[in-house]
Amino acid sequence: MAAGSTGERPFFEIITSIRYWIIHAVTLPAIFIAGFLFVYTGLAYDAFGTPRPDSYFQASESKAPVVTQRYDAKSQLDLRTK
């Protein structure tokens, strides 16, 4: 063991080993597929409590609500949602 070594395997030795690629050939695609399904099924919206893209505005609204009074914004938005 060289002086100053932590006793760990060198990175180059790890990424050139067959064992590394056997493990990662399965885990990396699995993580990608799991993330894709998490977003695609809409579970991400439910888990984080964000509205889905089709529910940002009411069906009768044609554009985003605009606040005209800076200090009265809360009451203006409350009026629009009733």
Swiss-Prot record:
Positions of transmembrane segments: 22-36
Record's subcellular location: Cellular thylakoid membrane
Residues that coordinate or bind heme: 24
Topological relation to the membrane, as annotated: Single-pass membrane protein
Required cofactor(s): heme b
Cofactor details (free text): With its partner (PsbF) binds heme. PSII binds additional chlorophylls, carotenoids and specific lipids.
Pfam families (UniProt xref): Cytochrom_B559 (PF00283), Cytochrom_B559a (PF00284)
Keyword NADP: no
Sequence similarity: Belongs to the PsbE/PsbF family.
Function of the molecule: This b-type cytochrome is tightly associated with the reaction center of photosystem II (PSII). PSII is a light-driven water:plastoquinone oxidoreductase that uses light energy to abstract electrons from H(2)O, generating O(2) and a proton gradient subsequently used for ATP formation. It consists of a core antenna complex that captures photons, and an electron transfer chain that converts photonic excitation into a charge separation.
This protein's name: Cytochrome b559 subunit alpha
